[in-house]
């Protein structure tokens, strides 16, 4: 059993899993492989499965306003977890986090607020029908073996935003006020920093492009090369990340918990 990881669970109450490094190109119908608490992104579903004669790929619904998430806040997070999340967001935006911890050194807790959140999604019923009609690509070797071992997942929904707002509080529960120009000087020009006033406890970090920061997925079950079932991935149970680096040669490799431990050339 794994210890509870607050980084993984901060989106749980909203029904999503986290993307450890938010990205612009994460979307539904992508293939993931589990490695411990994380899921590695492998590629598009149409590179693994060949559509049958009757059912096409599910239709992607893009840029639907996620009204249930926009304007919502997380619960209180420790300042360490909050700054870790903020650091990954700033890194994805092309900003710097060096020196930011000194500005938040008097903070005890942090809270994130999600603004202008949009969702890309596919209907799970349509995906279920597609999987029932599709065949495994005959040229897929290692990933097809992972599919047969029930180690693969398909993304079904992603949430994205250009704005990530964080509010910090001190140990006595009062707001920690920060100076907007000071924060802007630390993170750099790639990130727009704003607030209700030049000195404020609630700071919005804005990217020029939407970044995907949460996802939903289903696990695939296959038997003798045929699709049998799907199972929703529990929210807050896993994080998505890029392929890891092998320590010996630096090459990207797919690592899994199953018998197929290292696959090169993915």
Curated annotation (Swiss-Prot):
Keywords: Antiviral defense, Cell inner membrane, Cell membrane, Cytoplasm, Lipoprotein, Membrane, Palmitate, Transmembrane, Transmembrane beta strand. It comes from the Bacteria. Disulfide bonds: none annotated. The chain crosses the membrane at residues 69-85, 97-115, 163-180, 189-205. A lipid is attached at residue 3 (S-palmitoyl cysteine). Palmitoylation helps stabilize the inactive state; may self palmitoylate. Palmitoylation plays a significant role in pore formation. One of its GO terms (biological process) is defense response to virus. GO terms for cellular component: cytoplasm; plasma membrane. The N-terminus has marked structural similarity to the mammalian gasdermin N-terminal domain. The C-terminal region wraps around the twisted beta sheet core, probably stabilizing the inactive state. The beta-stranded transmembrane 'fingers' of the active protein form by local refolding of several alpha helices found only in the inactive state. Reorientation of the N-terminus probably flips the palmitoyl moiety for insertion into the membrane. Belongs to the bacterial gasdermin family. This is Gasdermin bGSDM. It comes from Desulfuromonadales bacterium.
């Amino acid at each position: 059993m794994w210890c509870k990881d607050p980084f993984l669970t901060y989106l749980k109450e909203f029904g999503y899993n986290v993307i450890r490094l938010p990205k612009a190109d994460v979307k539904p119908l992508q293939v993931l492989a589990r490695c411990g608490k994380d899921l590695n992104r492998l590629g598009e579903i149409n590179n693994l499965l060949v559509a049958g004669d009757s059912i096409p790929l599910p239709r992607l619904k893009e840029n639907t306003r996620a009204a249930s998430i926009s304007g919502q806040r997380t619960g209180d997070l420790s300042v360490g977890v909050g700054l870790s999340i903020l650091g990954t967001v700033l890194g994805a935006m092309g900003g710097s986090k060096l020196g930011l911890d000194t500005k938040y050194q008097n903070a005890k807790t942090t809270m994130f607020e999600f603004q202008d959140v949009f969702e890309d999604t596919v209907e799970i019923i349509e995906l279920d029908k597609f999987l029932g009609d599709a065949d495994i690509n005959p040229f897929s070797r290692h990933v097809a073996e992972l599919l047969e071992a029930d180690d693969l997942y398909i993304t079904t929904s992603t949430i994205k935003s250009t704005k990530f707002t964080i509010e910090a509080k001190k140990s006595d529960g009062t707001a920690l006020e920060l100076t907007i120009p000071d924060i802007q000087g630390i993170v750099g020009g790639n990130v727009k920093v704003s607030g209700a006033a030049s000195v404020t406890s609630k700071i919005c970090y804005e990217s020029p492009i939407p970044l995907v920061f949460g996802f939903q997925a289903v696990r695939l079950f296959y038997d003798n090369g045929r699709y049998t079932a799907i199972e929703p991935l529990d929210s807050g149970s896993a994080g998505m990340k890029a392929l890891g680096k092998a320590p010996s040669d630096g090459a990207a490799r797919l690592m899994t918990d199953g018998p197929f431990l290292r696959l090169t050339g993915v």
